Amino acid sequence: MEDFVRQCFNPMIVELAEKAMKEYGEDPKLETNKFAAICTHLEVCFMYSDFHFIDERGESIIVESSDPNALLKHRFEIIEGRDRTMAWTVVNSICNTTGVEKPKFLPDLYDYKENRFIEVGVTRREVHIYYLEKANKIKSEKTHIHIFSFTGEEMATKEDYTLDEESRARIKTRLYTIRQEMASRGLWDSFRQSERGEETIEERFEITGTMRRLADQSLPPNFSSLENFRAYVDGFEPNGCIEGKLSQMSKEVNARIEPFLKTTPRPLRLPDGPPCSQRSKFLLMDALKLSIEDPSHEGEGIPLYDAIKCMKTFFGWKEPNIVKPHEKGINPNYLLAWKQVLAELQDIENEEKIPKTKNMKKTSQLKWALGENMAPEKVDFEDCKDVSDLKQYDSDEPERRSPASWIQSEFNKACELTDSSWIELDEIGEDVAPIEHIASMRRNYFTAEVSHCRATEYIMKGVYINTALLNASCAAMDDFQLIPMISKCRTKEGRRKTNLYGFIIKGRSHLRNDTDVVNFVSMEFSLTDPRLEPHKWEKYCVLEIGDMLLRTAIGQVSRPMFLYVRTNGTSKIKMKWGMEMRRCLLQSLQQIESMIEAESSVKEKDMTKEFFENKSETWPIGESPKGVEEGSIGKVCRTLLAKSVFNSLYASPQLEGFSAESRKLLLIVQALRDNLEPGTFNLGGLYEAIEECLINDPWVLLNASWFNSFLTHALK
């Protein structure tokens, strides 16, 4: 690189650059990228000023030959390239003669025509990013900034580029040539990456048009453009006294910092109203499986074949009837839909060869349940933009719901162990790198604790259903395809098992955008009598479809078998996330790992083995009205997993908001517990932000009641 610099640049520039580096105690032989950067910058500054003069009338002119006419004055004063003392002398004399405000940092040029200092930048990164860094550093609206990049882009304050097109094109061409020359010698990559700040690139959106005008109009007082507001915000030093910072921000803001004491916080106000209802895409604790062990039938693994085989294991079918109607729906249609499924499955069996997929006949009951032809007709915006009172539908506020005990039971069930294993050891993927012994040991211990957990069953069920539904939505867009809800597991003895939970019928699915909705009807087996908690099943129509013989301690008993039917919907983006529910395993494993790391750093050795094998030790799991609940390490793993799984199953904007806002209050309370004497302002506003997310979502309401328990115990 050093040789390249000496060949490529004018000897005067090279000499100036060496002098500048030595002034800062840097060695051009060692810091060759910096050497090249300084030379490039010097050359751009000289090219910026070359050939630009001011004539006797004070007009700016370009003269390319050395005209003997001495009445011309150079348009630009070059400050860059002088030693510091001399440079400041020049700046001071300019300020004294022109009355321009003295800059805090040495600029590169002074423009006698526009009467302003100019900071010239040459960057190997995005011009905006470098522009903002410069603006941040100099924090002066008086100094004009002009940035060039090696790719031919440029950016200048208020898009005022000072020079004519041709002069700027010369500079860009020269920079491009330098880049090509470096690249041909294999020097460019190292040079490009060596620019400070490469790691912290933030993609900046280019804002144009209306949004740009709106942005410029909606700035706080005293800012002339979005750019200088951004620069100000980016340069805001966050540490230090809050009151001082606030007064620095605006004259109008005066925040009184209130001390946060044990008596300060109040519990979150939970909404009143009827109890909340189940809103998951499939049944959780209430699901019932029809299963086959060691499946070896013809077509094993083809969902439809597996489903028919599972259906044949049950002999207690009976004439279905409605035991809990859906308040708003046409219940006979749900009944007819189930009868249609049974009839069409029977038809399949009567065929010579069972097909791989089954499309249902488009009967009136299915059209109704799947909302066929219900969507309002779409009108092209061009045709209606002149309608004077065009507005969005008025939608009702969601009805507020109170917490219900069923969601706590659902969560408790999700933490329990089942008698089957739902994942193989390698389900939490192998690391690509040669992974350390410790990491694989942790993974194996963790997998052993959660492989039989019901939350893991929900993961595999969710992955299966979402994958099948997304596939069908893309492959059979117009068809009402019948999709069996299936999962696979291993029994204690290691035998494979295939389970059928029920069926889904998918509606039309022309999904262009990520958020376009596909409707489906789900029909799921259960032994839960819906009349015990009717509020939980508000969105369902429940049929009684058979009697099941169950083995109990007192012998065989017959229990009615129910079918939970409802209309539901999902979108491409939701199905994509549903397919990736295995990530929940990874998230909870990482949480456990951080607990192990904390232990290990205290003991100064790896505690993985002790952590999992010391069965006598208990760990905090969570807060309940009784106080801090504790349990074995396995219970902690399963609880963390269940939380992660429920965050996925019950994902919603309410949950997003609640998690983000309640976390702030949590941090304040924890600071109080750690005797850090926290202070707050506008605590009421924070409570408002949290409570506006408490509307009707069962999982959010449960988290809020846990939060209240935490507050009670934390502040005792």
From Swiss-Prot:
Organism: Influenza A virus (strain A/Chicken/Brescia/1902 H7N7)
Gene3D superfamilies from the UniProt entry: Influenza RNA-dependent RNA polymerase subunit PA, endonuclease domain (3.40.91.90)
UniProt-annotated location(s): Host cytoplasm; Host nucleus
Motif position, Nuclear localization signal 2 (NLS2): 184-247
Cofactor: Mn(2+)
This protein's name: Polymerase acidic protein
Major localisation: host cell
Residues binding Mn(2+) 2, per UniProt: 80, 108
Modification after translation (UniProt): Phosphorylated on serines and threonines by host kinases, including human casein kinase II.
Sequence motif Nuclear localization signal 1 (NLS1), location on chain: 124-139
MF (Gene Ontology): endonuclease activity; metal ion binding; RNA binding
Function: Plays an essential role in viral RNA transcription and replication by forming the heterotrimeric polymerase complex together with PB1 and PB2 subunits. The complex transcribes viral mRNAs by using a unique mechanism called cap-snatching. It consists in the hijacking and cleavage of host capped pre-mRNAs. These short capped RNAs are then used as primers for viral mRNAs. The PB2 subunit is responsible for the binding of the 5' cap of cellular pre-mRNAs which are subsequently cleaved after 10-13 nucleotides by the PA subunit that carries the endonuclease activity.
Biological process (GO), any one: viral translational frameshifting
Assembly with partners or alone: Influenza RNA polymerase is composed of three subunits: PB1, PB2 and PA. Interacts (via C-terminus) with PB1 (via N-terminus).
Assigned protein family: Belongs to the influenza viruses PA family.
Classification via InterPro entries: INFV_PA, PA/PA-X, PA/PA-X_sf
GO cellular component: host cell cytoplasm; host cell nucleus
Binding site for Mn(2+) 1: 41, 108, 119-120
Record lineage: Viruses, Riboviria, Orthornavirae, Negarnaviricota, Polyploviricotina
